[in-house]
């Protein structure tokens, strides 16, 4: 089972050493180390060779990628548990990002350092909920002892020492990223930064409140529902007005308010969503499928016109019919999912060609004209 940062849990059959499996619905390959080279018929054979030899030969290492050009996500272990974690990312040119994890302490197992392919080292400053609570108490005490000091929102919040162990989003250990520091740059070995590249602050509930850049300027801000942990009700970018959101009892967005733009209202029915903007223009989206395979199959536009879309069993677009009833077909390669041809409403066809790395090499138009492209690798 491969768990990614998007919340997906993708199931694969157990792999033998050197074996590669492909998920058509998720467009993702999962591979297991154990061989020096893949057979030339394997689409990932060239990308396999950019990996370090020890990674290719180790049957204990698993790798994932969503493109024949990379990158590889290397899943290994600091010491052998029943699961593997991301340890290295290697791109199609062999350049790497290596992740270093804390071996002990309150943040054991969390990423605390990154080394890139140029030799630069970055430190990830982490904090626990207890540490943030202690810092908040000290800030609050300092504020109370100095009446002239301005009272911030954060100083008025009561930070609990722990967070609920389980949330509707999953387990939460309370560890958060506080700042990212550049600690070593081979090009400037004698220079030490005096400020982090980025800094983050959090609410008493562990939600991200603000993001600051290296100059100390706040570039993002977030507000949350006090009754529903993790539910964002507003956000803004530096120099821009705040966008706000309202929700129904099931946690679905019912309204988006944009002070300097259009506002939107959302109504939900069985397999449909009605979207109305502040100019009273109305669109309706009709959906089919469940979970990650849910797709919009029909769209009623504000002018009354209707477009329809058709998908294959993997959720990939295979045809669209416009408001005039003209149908365009999209034909895909069975294994890779790449677009091989487009059949226009009048029956004419545009064809697409690819190389062994699935990079687009040619487009042939209905009138016979052909464009081509070449790659240096």
Predicted region positions:
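Extended charged/polar low-complexity repeat regions
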Residues: 1-377
């Amino acid at each position: 089972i491969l768990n990614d940062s998007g919340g997906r849990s993708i199931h694969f059959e157990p792999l033998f050493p050197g074996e590669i499996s492909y998920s058509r619905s998720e467009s993702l390959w999962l591979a297991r180390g154990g061989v020096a080279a893949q057979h030339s018929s394997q689409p990932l054979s060239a990308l396999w060779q950019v990996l370090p030899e020890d990674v290719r030969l180790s049957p204990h290492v698993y790798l994932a990628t969503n493109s024949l050009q990379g990158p590889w996500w290397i899943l290994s272990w600091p010491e052998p548990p029943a699961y593997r974690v991301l340890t290295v990312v290697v791109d199609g040119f062999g350049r790497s990002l290596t992740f270093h994890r804390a071996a002990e302490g309150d943040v054991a197992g969390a990423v605390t350092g990154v080394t890139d392919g140029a030799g630069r080292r970055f430190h990830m400053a982490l904090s626990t909920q207890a540490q943030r609570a202690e810092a908040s108490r000290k800030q609050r005490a300092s504020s109370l002892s100095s009446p002239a000091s301005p009272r911030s929102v954060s100083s008025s919040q009561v930070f609990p020492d722990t967070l609920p162990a389980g949330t509707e989003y999953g387990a939460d250990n309370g560890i958060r990223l506080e700042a990212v520091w550049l600690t070593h740059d081979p090009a400037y070995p004698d220079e030490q930064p005096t400020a982090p590249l980025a800094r983050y602050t959090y609410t008493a509930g562990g939600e991200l409140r603000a993001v600051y850049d290296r100059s100390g300027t706040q570039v993002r801000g977030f507000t949350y529902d006090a009754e529903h942990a993790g539910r964002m009700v507003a956000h803004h970018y530096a120099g821009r007005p705040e966008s706000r959101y309202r929700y129904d009892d099931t946690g679905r967005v019912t309204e988006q308010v944009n002070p300097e733009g259009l506002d939107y209202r959302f109504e939900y029915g069985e397999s449909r969503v009605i979207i109305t903007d502040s100019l009273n223009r109305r669109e309706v989206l009709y959906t089919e499928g469940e979970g990650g395979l849910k797709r919009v199959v029909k769209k009623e536009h504000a002018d009354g016109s209707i477009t329809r879309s058709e998908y294959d069993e993997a959720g990939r677009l295979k045809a669209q019919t416009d408001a005039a009833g003209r149908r365009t077909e999209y034909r895909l390669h069975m294994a890779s999912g790449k677009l091989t041809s487009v059949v226009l409403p009048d029956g004419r066809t545009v064809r697409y060609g690819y190389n062994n790395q699935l990079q687009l090499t040619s487009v042939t138009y209905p009138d016979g004209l052909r464009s081509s492209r070449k790659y240096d690798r």
